């Protein structure tokens, strides 16, 4: 299938393409390795998180990776983190929800595709009603990819936190709907929260120094509630703990 233009008007073709798109795993690993060499995050684990994560990835159990969103470089920090954690084994088998603006420039589009990107049309750009159908289809595709054995990485705040990067913004139910749709199809994903901090002097979405971020990997959450909003509440609490860990370790 030819790669479609990523526009809201074309959302059905967009999600038909990303339902099956899979990047070259070798090239993806090279890209992630280069991002680690550039960004070199300093990774800290909760007590048994590293061993549990290694076992999960080895077993093939699918993960929803939730990370906080404080700069325009977070996706690169997260990719660099994946390279230097047990998540390395999942490179090429992880989808990343990414705002549609990242798919406009052809070169950036290619790079985001290499990272496993799936476009998201955000209500803050188009309005809630305009993106409703596209949003439902995006959640269906995301759940389907989980059911096929892919992991899913999400920045569930939805937009950069420009107020207080130490405190999460409100997390809506979208991540919960994706997890529930996967569970309804027989696959119960495990939540993995990853907190990111660029230090007390980092302000705004484009701080001067985004290298050597402090990254905190929480212990996986195996049992999620049944209702989407309840899942979102669990994510809010668990991800805040990860953010606290990243801030403390900076």
Which role fits each region the language model picked out?
Residues 35-62:
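A short, well-structured juxtamembrane/interface segment
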Residues 69-71, 157-160:
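Short glycine-rich anion-binding loops that position phosphate/pyrophosphate groups of nucleotides
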Residues 130-138:
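Glycine-rich anion/phosphate-binding loops
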Residues 144, 220, 227-250:
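A cross-taxonomic marker for long C-terminal extensions/tails that follow the last structured domain
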Residues 109-110, 151, 159-230:
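A cross-family acyltransferase "interaction/gating" segment
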Residues 17, 57-130:
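Catalytic core of membrane glycerolipid acyltransferases/transacylases, capturing the structured
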Residues 18-41, 105-115, 208:
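Alpha-helical membrane-targeting segments
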């Amino acid at each position: 299938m030819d790669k479609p233009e990523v526009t809201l008007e074309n959302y059905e073709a967009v999600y038909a393409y990303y339902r099956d798109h899979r990047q070259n795993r070798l090239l993806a690993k090279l890209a992630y390795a280069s991002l680690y060499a550039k960004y070199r995050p300093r990774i800290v684990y909760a007590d048994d998180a590293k061993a549990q994560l290694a076992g999960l990835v080895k077993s093939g159990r699918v993960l929803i990776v939730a990370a906080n969103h404080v700069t325009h470089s977070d996706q690169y920090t997260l990719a660099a983190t994946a390279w230097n954690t047990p998540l390395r084994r999942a490179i090429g088998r992880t989808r990343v929800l990414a705002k549609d603006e990242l798919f406009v420039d052809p070169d950036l589009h290619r790079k985001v595709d290499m990272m496993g990107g799936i476009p998201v049309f955000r209500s803050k750009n188009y309005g809630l009603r305009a993106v409703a159908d596209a949003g439902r289809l995006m959640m269906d595709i995301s759940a389907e990819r989980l059911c096929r054995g892919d992991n899913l990485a999400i920045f569930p705040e939805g937009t950069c936190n420009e107020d207080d990067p130490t405190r999460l913004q409100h997390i809506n139910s979208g991540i919960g709907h994706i997890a529930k749709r996967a569970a309804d199809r027989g696959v119960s994903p495990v939540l993995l929260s990853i907190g990111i901090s660029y230090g007390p002097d980092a302000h705004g979405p484009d701080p001067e120094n985004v290298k050597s971020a402090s990254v905190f990997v929480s212990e996986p959450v195996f049992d999620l509630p049944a209702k989407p909003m309840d899942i979102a509440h669990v994510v809010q609490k668990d991800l805040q703990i990860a953010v606290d860990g990243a801030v403390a370790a900076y």
